[in-house]
A protein has these predicted regions:
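Extracellular-facing binding/remodeling surfaces
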Residues: 1-2, 18-31
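Short glycine- and acidic-rich boundary segments immediately preceding or forming the N-terminal edge
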Residues: 3, 85, 96, 116-162
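Primarily a LysM-type cell-wall glycan-binding module
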Residues: 8-18, 31-37, 67-91, 113, ...
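A glycine-rich, coil/turn loop motif that links secondary-structure elements
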Residues: 29-39, 54-58
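Conserved hydrophobic/aromatic packing and binding residues within compact polymer-binding modules
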Residues: 42, 97
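Short beta-strand-to-loop junctions in surface cap/lid or active-site-entrance loops
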Residues: 164-172, 180
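Active-site/substrate-binding loop(s) of hydrolase catalytic cores
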Residues: 172, 186-196, 200-340, 348
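Metallocarboxypeptidase
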Residues: 279-425
Length: 425
C-alpha cells in the first residue's frame, strides 16, 4: 500500500479505515477520505502498538495493522495456552481455529508452535471500493483461514500486479468464473470474493449455499475464480494507483477522449487496451467496428489493441483457460441485468437450458449479444474454441461504476447463478 496521510483519498484509505474499525480503534465509517477523525484513530492505534503516533500510515503501521487487513493473527503457543484461552483472547471461534489449522491436536499444544487464529469478521468487505492491495490481503486471509483454498498468480498486469486465480473443490466438473475485465466494473470483484468466502464458510460449518450443501457442491465441482482481471485499471478508477508515470500516461490517454469521464469512465487496462476486446474470436470485426467509432488508439475504453492477446492480462486468462479446460465459464460485468449466452450461431449443447435456469433464479433477461459488442470478448472466444457454455453476466443497472448500494441486490440475484453453474443444473 502507499503511504497515506491527511488529505489522501481512495480505496486504500477506505481499506485502512476498515482495518482500524476492525481493530476497534474508532474513526469514521470508511469513506476513503483521510481527515482529522481518521488521523486520530490511526494515532490511537499507533500508540497502542508502541509506534510513533505521527498519524501517517506507512510500512510500520501497515505491518502492525496486518491482522485486521487480512483477517487472521499468527499466535505462538506459550506455556498454559489452550484453544479455549486463545478463542477468548482473540474473540475467535474454536471451529474457525480448527478449520484454519487442520493438523492441529488441541490436546498437545507445544510451546513455540504457531497457529493461525481467524479474527471475528469476514475477510471480504462489500462496503468499500476494491483495489489490488485489498485483493492481495483477501487472498492471504482466505487461504490461511481455509487451507483447502488454492491460490496462484496466473500472470502479471502491465504494472506487474498479480492476476490471482483461486480454486476450491475436488469435483470432476471444472468451472471458471472471472470478474473485472473492465476497470470501472470492479463491483463484480467483491461479488465473486463474497461467493467464495460464503462457500468456504458453509463447507466448514456444514451449511448450505442456495439450498445445496456446500460439501456436495465442492464434491461435484472444482471452482476456479479470477476475480480481478484488470488490477491496474481498477486501481486507477478507485483512486489506489500511485502518482507517477503510469497515472500520467493514463491521464494523457483520457485527455484525448474528453467525452469520457475520467477516471470513472475508464474500462481499459492501464495501457488503454480494452481487455474484453482482446480475444481471437472475430477480433478483426471488432477492430473495424471500434475503429469506425473512433477508438483506433489507446483509449479509456473500446480500443482492441494492436493484435489479439497482446495485453498481458487477457493473454494470461486465455492461457490459463486453455490449461484448465473448464466445462463452463462465467464472465462478470456491469450493467444491464442481462445474460449473454451465444456467440454468432454457436450454441453449445445445454447452453440455452442453463441460460433459462440462470434467468429464472436471477430475474435477469437472457439475450443475444448486440452486434456492435458481439466480437472479441472472452465469452465469445470460449464458446468458439471449446464449444461449451459460456456466459457474460451483466449485473446491476445504471452508470458504471455502479454504487455499492447496489451490491446486495446484485448478490441476491447472482447467488443462484454462481451455484447452479458449478453444479451444471
Amino acid at each position: 500500500m502507499q503511504i497515506l496521510k491527511t488529505g489522501s483519498t481512495g480505496a486504500e484509505v477506505a481499506l485502512m479505515q476498515t482495518a482500524l474499525s476492525r481493530a476497534q480503534h474508532g474513526g469514521p465509517a470508511p469513506d476513503g477520505i483521510f481527515g482529522g477523525a481518521t488521523k486520530s484513530a490511526l494515532q490511537a492505534f499507533q500508540r497502542s502498538r508502541g509506534l510513533t503516533p505521527d498519524g501517517i500510515f506507512g510500512a510500520e503501521s501497515e505491518r502492525a495493522l496486518a491482522p485486521w487487513l487480512r483477517g487472521y493473527a499468527v499466535h505462538t503457543i506459550r506455556p498454559g495456552d489452550s484453544l479455549f484461552s486463545l478463542a477468548e483472547r482473540y474473540d475467535a471461534s474454536l471451529a474457525a481455529i480448527e478449520t484454519a489449522n487442520p493438523a492441529l491436536d488441541p490436546f498437545t499444544l507445544r510451546p513455540g508452535q504457531k497457529l493461525v487464529v481467524p479474527l471475528p469478521f469476514s475477510v471480504v468487505p462489500t462496503d468499500i471500493p476494491w483495489c489490488s492491495a485489498l485483493m492481495d490481503y483477501a487472498v492471504d486471509g482466505l487461504t490461511h483461514r481455509y487451507p483447502q483454498l488454492r491460490a496462484e498468480s496466473i500472470g502479471r498486469s502491465v504494472l506487474s500486479r498479480p492476476v490471482w486465480a483461486l480454486t476450491v473443490g475436488d469435483g470432476l466438473r471444472r468451472v471458471l468464473y472471472s470478474a473485472a475485465h473492465h476497470a470501472n466494473e470492479w463491483i463484480t470483484t467483491p461479488l465473486l470474493m463474497k461467493y467464495l468466502e460464503t462457500l468456504l464458510h458453509a463447507d466448514a460449518a456444514g451449511e448450505t449455499v442456495f439450498g445445496y450443501p456446500a460439501e456436495d457442491i465442492l464434491f461435484r465441482a472444482t471452482l476456479t475464480l479470477v476475480p480481478l482481471v484488470d488490477p491496474d485499471g481498477v486501481d486507477l478508477v478507485t483512486g489506489a494507483l500511485p502518482e507517477g508515470e503510469a497515472k500520467e500516461r493514463a491521464a494523457a490517454i483520457a485527455a484525448d477522449f474528453p467525452a469520457i469521464p475520467y477516471p470513472d469512465g475508464w474500462k481499459a487496462n492501464i495501457a488503454g487496451v480494452d481487455l474484453n476486446l482482446q480475444y481471437p474470436a472475430g477480433w478483426d470485426t471488432a477492430r473495424a467496428i471500434k475503429f469506425a467509432q473512433g477508438y483506433d488508439r489507446p483509449a479509456p475504453r473500446d480500443f482492441v489493441g494492436d493484435a489479439p492477446l497482446t495485453a498481458p492480462e487477457s493473454a494470461a486468462l486465455a492461457a490459463f483457460t486453455e490449461a484448465l479446460d473448464p466445462a463452463l465459464v462465467l464472465a462478470y460485468h456491469t450493467q444491464g441485468n442481462v445474460i449473454y449466452w451465444k456467440y454468432l450461431n454457436f450454441e453449445p449443447e445445454g447452453s440455452r437450458a442453463l441460460a433459462e435456469q440462470f434467468a429464472a433464479v436471477s430475474g435477469y433477461a437472457y439475450e443475444d449479444t448486440p452486434y456492435a459488442s458481439g466480437f472479441a470478448g472472452y465469452k465469445d472466444w470460449f464458446i468458439q474454441n471449446f464449444d461449451r457454455p459460456g456466459y457474460t453476466i451483466e449485473c446491476g443497472l445504471g452508470e458504471n461504476p455502479l454504487p455499492l448500494s447496489q451490491f446486495e441486490s446484485i448478490w441476491s440475484a447472482n447467488l443462484g447463478i454462481l451455484t447452479l453453474a458449478a453444479l451444471g443444473i
